[in-house]
């Protein structure tokens, strides 16, 4: 949908032209004055509502995110955050505080990783929760493209994953979903659920982009136990299956390396 038409549907007044912004592989994104408008070509039902719920969940837990002005099946209208200087130490403080929070139980509403639908799930033992809610749907979707790696992926989760306690997660925390606003570090495009912080740490490590100073400050504020470090490749398998699904078999090498390191 045209961004100006979406603003009209939302009952919001455009304050200037629609200027394209980088929107990644899923959405088309524009700045229109004080608003950011996101749309997508034939989005799966519930995509933008899930994003809005995730932003609200992070905001309720003290994370800076763009305010949601309107959400519908066609798109999402957010507040535009003025850019500011990089503040990796501030980001480390934000994420350490988020990951230190303890929730009542593991919990995921039906949602998405990118545009891939994920089921809801609540409670239970962590390894089963993570495997059945996150890994298994992607494993089933990519099985025929894994060149025999499927059984090796299954075997990874027959050993328990370490459990520090249920914590709120961004859920898709690569460096492109970090935004340094004038007011301080902000997070974008969450795939929010309550799980173990190793999931976020694994995605941050997978594609890099987080400098040494970030990791130093995060580690000072919330040290990462050795058993969590050792589990990161098993969490990375989740994201690499998603990359095989979206982008093809070029990611099988990285998937094999994560399996081998597990």
UniProtKB/Swiss-Prot annotation:
Its EC number is 2.7.1.-. It is an enzyme of class 2 (transferase). Gene3D superfamilies: 3.90.1200.10, Phosphorylase Kinase, domain 1. It comes from the Bacteria. GO terms for molecular function: ATP binding; kinase activity; phosphotransferase activity, alcohol group as acceptor; protein-ribulosamine 3-kinase activity. The keyword Membrane does not apply. The active site is at residue 172. It catalyses: N(6)-(D-ribulosyl)-L-lysine + ATP = N(6)-(3-O-phospho-D-ribulosyl)-L-lysine + ADP + H(+); N(6)-(D-erythrulosyl)-L-lysine + ATP = N(6)-(3-O-phospho-D-erythrulosyl)-L-lysine + ADP + H(+); N(6)-D-ribulosyl-L-lysyl-[protein] + ATP = N(6)-(3-O-phospho-D-ribulosyl)-L-lysyl-[protein] + ADP + H(+); N(6)-(D-erythrulosyl)-L-lysyl-[protein] + ATP = N(6)-(3-O-phospho-D-erythrulosyl)-L-lysyl-[protein] + ADP + H(+). InterPro entries: Fructo-/Ketosamine-3-kinase, Kinase-like_dom_sf. ATP binds at residues 79-81. Keywords: ATP-binding, Kinase, Nucleotide-binding, Transferase. Ketoamine kinase that phosphorylates ketoamines, such as erythruloselysine and ribuloselysine, on the third carbon of the sugar moiety to generate ketoamine 3-phosphate. Has higher activity on free lysine (erythruloselysine and ribuloselysine), than on ribuloselysine and erythruloselysine residues on glycated proteins. PANTHER family: FRUCTOSAMINE 3 KINASE-RELATED PROTEIN, PROTEIN-RIBULOSAMINE 3-KINASE. Belongs to the fructosamine kinase family. This is Probable ketoamine kinase TTHA1179. It comes from Thermus thermophilus (strain ATCC 27634 / DSM 579 / HB8). The lineage of its organism: Bacteria, Thermotogati, Deinococcota, Deinococci, Thermales.
């Amino acid at each position: 949908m045209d961004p100006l038409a979406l603003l009209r549907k939302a009952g919001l007044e455009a304050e200037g032209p629609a200027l394209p912004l980088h929107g990644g592989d899923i959405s088309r994104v524009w700045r229109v004055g004080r608003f950011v408008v996101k749309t997508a070509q034939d989005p799966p039902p519930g995509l933008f509502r899930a994003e809005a719920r995730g932003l609200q969940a992070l905001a309720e837990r003290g994370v800076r995110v763009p305010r949601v002005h309107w959400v519908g099946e066609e798109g999402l209208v957010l507040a535009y955050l003025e850019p500011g200087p990089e503040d990796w130490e501030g980001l480390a403080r934000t994420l350490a505080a988020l990951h230190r929070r303890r929730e009542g139980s593991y919990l995921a509403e039906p949602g998405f990783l990118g545009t891939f639908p994920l089921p809801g799930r609540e409670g239970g033992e962590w390894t089963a929760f993570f495997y059945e809610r996150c890994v298994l749907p992607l494993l089933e979707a990519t099985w025929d493209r894994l060149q025999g790696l499927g059984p090796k992926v299954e075997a990874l989760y027959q050993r328990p994953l370490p459990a520090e306690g249920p914590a709120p997660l961004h859920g898709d925390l690569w460096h492109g979903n970090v935004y340094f606003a004038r007011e301080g570090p902000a997070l974008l495009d969450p795939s929010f659920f309550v799980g173990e912080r190793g999931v976020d740490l694994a995605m941050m490590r997978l594609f890099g982009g987080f400098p040494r100073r970030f990791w130093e400050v995060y580690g000072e504020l919330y040290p990462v136990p050795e058993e969590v470090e050792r589990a990161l490749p098993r969490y990375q398998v989740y994201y690499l299956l998603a990359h095989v699904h979206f982008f093809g078999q070029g990611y099988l090498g990285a998937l094999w390396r994560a399996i081998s390191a597990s």
